[in-house]
């Protein structure tokens, strides 16, 4: 007989939006808790007042075990794509905003209070031709990447495999070298 599996586990205060509009695709064997949303991993977060937000109107691919910590906001806009590699972990109170494409490789560890966004969240319009001067740009974060607390990853960034991003960093350019600490 086939056992019932619960691939998604939800912890604490979680707001889920766009359930019928968005797509969640598991590109891995389904096991219980392969995706954990709102899990408390930081003792200093207030478990009574810290809400996790899951707002996926686009497509989110999960390639293996993934954990979205307490107080995080995951937002994938309509027609946008976010990909989480195997063993993805964001600890808490971080914001992942995707309007086009954000890709995380395998074994990514993201600390708390991060902001990762592929957009400026506003448009700058050319006065000469009416075109958008600041379009969204994809973000690609390689495998075995560790991003320290209170860091900011901006649109258009590519981070190679095996990189450590130090706490309080702002990454606005590509990190092409492997095995570096930024």
Language model: regions and residue ranges:
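Domain-scale signature associated with acetyltransferase and cell-envelope carbohydrate enzymes
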Residues: 1-117, 142-144, 151, 161, ...
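Short, flexible, glycine/charge-rich loop motifs used to bind or transfer phosphoryl groups or to couple energy/partner
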Residues: 56-57, 79, 135-136, 170-171
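Short coil-to-beta-strand initiation/turn motif
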Residues: 72, 153, 169-171
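Short acidic/His/Gly/Ser-rich catalytic and metal-binding motifs that mark active-site loops
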Residues: 118-126
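Short, highly charged low-complexity linear segments
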Residues: 126-129, 172-173
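C-terminal segments of enzyme domains that contribute to small-molecule binding surfaces
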Residues: 128-155, 179-180
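C-terminal/domain-terminus segments
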Residues: 158-182
């Amino acid at each position: 007989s086939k056992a019932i599996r619960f691939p998604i586990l939800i912890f604490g205060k979680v707001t889920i939006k766009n359930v019928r509009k968005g797509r969640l695709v598991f590109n891995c064997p389904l096991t219980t808790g392969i995706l954990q949303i709102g899990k408390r991993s930081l003792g200093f977060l207030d478990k009574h007042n810290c809400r996790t937000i899951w707002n996926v109107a686009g497509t989110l691919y999960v390639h293996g075990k993934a954990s979205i910590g307490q107080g995080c906001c995951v937002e994938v806009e309509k027609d946008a794509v976010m990909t989480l590699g195997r063993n993805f972990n964001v600890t808490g109170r971080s914001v992942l905003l995707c309007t086009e494409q954000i890709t995380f490789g395998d074994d990514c560890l993201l600390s708390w209070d991060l902001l990762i966004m592929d957009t400026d969240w506003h448009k700058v319009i050319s006065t000469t031709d009416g075109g958008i001067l600041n379009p969204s740009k994809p973000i690609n974060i390689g495998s075995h990447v560790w991003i320290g607390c209170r860091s900011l990853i901006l649109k258009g960034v590519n981070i190679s495999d095996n990189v450590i991003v130090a706490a309080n960093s702002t990454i606005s350019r590509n990190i092409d070298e492997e095995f570096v600490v930024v």
